[in-house]
């Protein structure tokens, strides 16, 4: 649908493009079919870049010359259709993007700038070419809720009048939004608002509310950190904790350090955090109490400095050990003569020393096996886990390890009178109880 721009924008010097014409829904749908599919748009709902050549010629415009028909733009306004010809952009239509922006910023003719903005940012009629007279454009939108304010203002002369990719007048507004037009749409903006908008701030100065698009964005998560410190004078039942809330970790840590831990005048370094497992056992130094409180607050102030790692630690000692995984440093050598193994931390070296001393301090609670290293015990516990999930009565029989105690194999035809006299129901209960004992949480022993 071609609109007469002259009567709408007399103040900004935009002359008329030509006689105003109205096209029926059938004509618009036929143009959709006639244009075919092009790389930039599926139909008439693409951006209208500029009027056709004879439209500009009839208006006597000299700022911009004609543009070749194509990209669902020129044929939308002309009377003659050329389905077989889809031209490229005319070199004279816009000499460059710079010239276009200069004109819009006031360096060129005001009428030319207004004409350019009217043609570039206006949405042509059309969309997915549906049935004739179909005006439910919101059904074809990615965010249909963005057009809910204009969903009820459909024009009988417009097919799929909403712009397919637009945000209800945010960046590519319809021309009807800036003045009274032939379409009976009641839009959000009046004609005087047209004078002050630039090429990139359309609908930014007078935005309605926070913007319809922002309701689809994730709301910021409000983090509440609660202080669970119990003052010594409030230890009597019922215990009452501090319960002050903070939005950042820094605020919580500062509060606990200043208000509860205290300064050097404090001689007793005791953690009074709610449900602390130390149960009032004091620390020998204040820095140890501060480090311990990070277990409750979750503070980890020591990030790994190596790019791409992203790990953070609550203790500087743990960060120092971790950085050796990046540098490859292994300062702890095995003290056993003839062994050249080196380790990044002393605890790994201590675990390794059990190999030489034949000590096996890591015992399995399900059987009599013991191991020199906790990793070996963890592998062994997986055998018990798999056997407890299966139907084998004895995990040691399928463990794959040689055990010092041979497994006891219970035959179905055993001579044990107690076993043979069990009823099916009682044997089922016995079988279930045995599996429940084996299906304990094995990870709680060794991590």
Swiss-Prot record:
PROSITE patterns: ZINC_FINGER_C2H2_1, ZINC_FINGER_C2H2_2. Keywords: Activator, Cytoplasm, Developmental protein, Differentiation, DNA-binding, Metal-binding, Neurogenesis, Nucleus, Repeat, Transcription, Transcription regulation, Zinc, Zinc-finger. It comes from the Eukaryota. A zinc finger (C2H2-type) spans 225-260, 269-296, 302-326, 332-356, 362-384. Gene3D superfamilies: Classic Zinc Finger. Residues 375-434 are annotated as: Disordered. Pfam families: zf-C2H2, zf-C2H2_15, zf_ZIC. One of its GO terms (biological process) is gene expression. This is Zinc finger protein ZIC 1. It comes from Mus musculus (Mouse). The gene is Zic1.
């Amino acid at each position: 649908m071609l609109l007469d721009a002259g009567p709408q924008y007399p103040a900004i010097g935009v002359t008329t493009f030509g006689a105003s014409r109205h096209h029926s829904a059938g004509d618009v749908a036929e143009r959709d079919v006639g244009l075919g599919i092009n790389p930039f748009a599926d139909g008439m709902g693409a951006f209208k870049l500029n009027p056709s050549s004879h439209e500009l010629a009839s208006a006597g415009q000299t700022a911009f010359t004609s543009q070749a028909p194509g990209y669902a733009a020129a044929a939308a306004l002309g009377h003659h259709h050329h389905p077989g010809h889809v031209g490229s952009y005319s070199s004279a239509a816009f000499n460059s993007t710079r010239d276009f922006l200069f004109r819009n910023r006031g360096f060129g003719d005001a009428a030319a700038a207004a004409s350019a903005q009217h043609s570039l940012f206006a949405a042509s009629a059309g969309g997915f070419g549906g049935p004739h007279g179909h005006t439910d454009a919101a059904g074809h939108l990615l965010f249909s809720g963005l057009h809910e304010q204009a969903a009820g203002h459909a024009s009988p002369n417009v097919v799929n009048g909403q712009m397919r990719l637009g945000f209800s007048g945010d960046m590519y507004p319809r021309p009807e939004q800036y003045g009274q037009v032939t379409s009976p749409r009641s839009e959000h903006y009046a004609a005087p608002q047209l004078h002050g908008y630039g090429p990139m701030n359309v609908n930014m100065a007078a935005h309605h509310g926070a913007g319809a698009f922002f309701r689809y964005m994730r709301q910021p998560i409000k983090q509440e950190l609660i202080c669970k410190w119990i003052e010594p004078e409030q230890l009597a039942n019922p215990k009452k904790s501090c319960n002050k809330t903070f939005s950042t970790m820094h605020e919580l840590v500062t509060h606990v350090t200043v208000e509860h831990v205290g300064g050097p005048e404090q001689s007793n370094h005791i953690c009074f955090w709610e449900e602390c497992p130390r149960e009032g056992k004091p620390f020998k130094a204040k820095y140890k109490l501060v480090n311990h409180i990070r277990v409750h607050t979750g503070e980890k102030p020591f990030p790994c400095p190596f790019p791409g790692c992203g790990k953070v630690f609550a203790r500087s000692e743990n960060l120092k050990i971790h950085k050796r995984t990046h540098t490859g440093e292994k300062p702890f050598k095995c003290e056993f003569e003839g062994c050249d193994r080196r380790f990044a931390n002393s605890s790994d070296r201590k675990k390794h020393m059990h190999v030489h001393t034949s000590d096996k301090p890591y015992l399995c609670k399900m059987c009599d096996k013991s191991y020199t290293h906790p990793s070996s015990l963890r592998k062994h516990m997986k055998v018990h886990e798999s056997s407890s999930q299966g139907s084998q009565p004895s995990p040691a029989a399928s463990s794959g390890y040689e055990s010092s105690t041979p497994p006891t194999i219970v035959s179905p035809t055993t001579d044990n009178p107690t076993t043979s006299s069990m009823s099916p129901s009682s044997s089922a209960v016995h079988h279930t109880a045995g599996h429940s004992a084996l299906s304990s949480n094995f990870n709680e022993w060794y991590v």
